């Protein structure tokens, strides 16, 4: 279990470093990617997820990188609660480490950027239109799709019958 937790830590670090890094690059003043737009952010996050999973799996971890995915596996009976807790702690620590690296990397840009909303968006998201119920529904749908697709990729008989998400991605 310790090596798989390390893989989840490093994979999540890579995920957040690249994902939040592309957001910071697009939103912060005087960065080379400033103003590149929403498509660059979404493509960058897609690449970040791929890289995070590849790194985690290469280190022997399942590449789940998200407490919601871990919870789904506990509910499905493929993970024990103690195992899940260790991995969730590793994921959270990896996310904090990745965000810290983004903060350090863009250190001089934080002072140059006057838009507090842009600074906040580098580390969090907010709805375009606030509404508790619609926003909750949006998060539920997004999490369900994440878990559904991630589970489908790693299922026997999908993607050429391969058994792991790492092999399916190849």
Tell me the role of every PLM-derived stretch.
Residues 1-170:
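Membrane-interface helix-loop junctions and terminal tails of multi-pass membrane proteins
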């Amino acid at each position: 279990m310790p090596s798989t937790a390390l893989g989840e830590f490093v994979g999540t670090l890579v995920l957040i470093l690249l994902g939040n890094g592309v957001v910071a690059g697009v939103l912060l003043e005087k960065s080379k990617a400033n103003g590149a737009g929403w498509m660059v952010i979404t493509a960058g996050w897609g690449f970040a997820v791929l890289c995070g999973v590849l790194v985690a799996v290469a280190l022997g971890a399942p590449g789940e990188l998200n407490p919601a995915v871990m919870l789904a596996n506990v509910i499905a009976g493929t993970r024990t609660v103690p195992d899940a807790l260790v991995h969730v702690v590793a994921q959270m620590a990896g996310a904090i480490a990745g965000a810290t690296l983004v903060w350090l990397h863009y250190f001089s840009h934080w002072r140059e950027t006057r838009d507090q909303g842009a600074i906040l968006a580098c580390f969090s998201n907010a709805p375009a239109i606030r509404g508790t119920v619609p926003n909750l529904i949006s998060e539920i749908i997004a999490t369900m799709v994440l878990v559904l697709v991630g589970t489908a990729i790693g299922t026997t008989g999908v993607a050429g019958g391969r058994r792991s998400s790492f092999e399916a991605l190849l």
